[in-house]
Amino acid sequence: MKKIVIIFILSILIFSCSKEKFEAHSENQFLMGTVCIITLYNGESQEIFKGAFDVIEKQDLLMSLQKGISELSKVNASSGIQAVSVSEDTYQVVQASKYYANLTMGAFDPTIAPLVELWGIGSDHEGQVPHKEEIEKMKSLIDYRKLEISDDKRIFLKDKGMKIDLGGIAKGYIADVVKEYLISQGVKRGIINLGGNIIVIGSKPEGHPWKIGIQDPFESRGTYIGIAEVIDKTIVTSGIYERFFYVDGKRYHHILDPETGYPVENDLASITIISEKSIDADALSTSLFVLGVEKGMDLIESIDNAEAVFVTKGRDVLYSSGANELFTLLDETYNEISLVQYLTTFSQ
């Protein structure tokens, strides 16, 4: 459920109403298997950047599946055997992952790790479709209802062989923690980009919203279909276009459906979530993609302070009730349509 998305950030130099010049200062490091970029505008010290990247590295050590010493790896190794005590951070992310699993009735399922490992999309052994028997075997290990979380911060997977994958939510949580750290250091404006999980802090110096370009799912990186104008928001996009392989002319992408065991097959090409917390945007972008347009729209309309932009394979763009106030479509090859129009067309 990991997602790598390219979101083009508009504006390098920011000017205040008084014509004072604010130059962007960016630092980047390769962490969590992706490029993490922090951009600040007030001449912050190098120590603040270092502290922010230290936060990312510390969190990754807790929840990464690629690090055998992580707390998450210890939980997975103890599945069917015993509960494992974890830190407050890991506890919060696992608890949030189960919340979204319940909310989506399993469309988002943190116990999907066995399937993710089997498909290996984005790994060195990608390129082959697993046998149906293998998929069914792994599916038997996926059930968020068998993930037990106790109030004393102990986590237990009831069946041996079960595993948790927080790839669809942890990066959002870490982005939120980085934002909290930067604000505690006096940062008033900036942009956090953790491999496509975008958080903007505050506004531009003159009080205007930041302008964030949203990737066109059918074009090369850095080509965007429109811009989101936001203040103190987070933006996360999931799509079929970043990690995939072809077999016999069919594309297999990395967003897996826990119910079928295969990559999601619906009419969506990408979905962008705009919300206040990146942990929510991260989980919702995957959840709504799995649910599809109709069920996804129903879910996003039931959630406060979160909006969605749906992009279909037919180049239609649909908005949740408040998204069109934040997002402007610039590419004229796309069509803005309502949910009613979409359902009428799609049913024909």
Label for each model-derived stretch:
Residues 4-6, 15-348:
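Mature catalytic core of soluble alpha/beta enzymes
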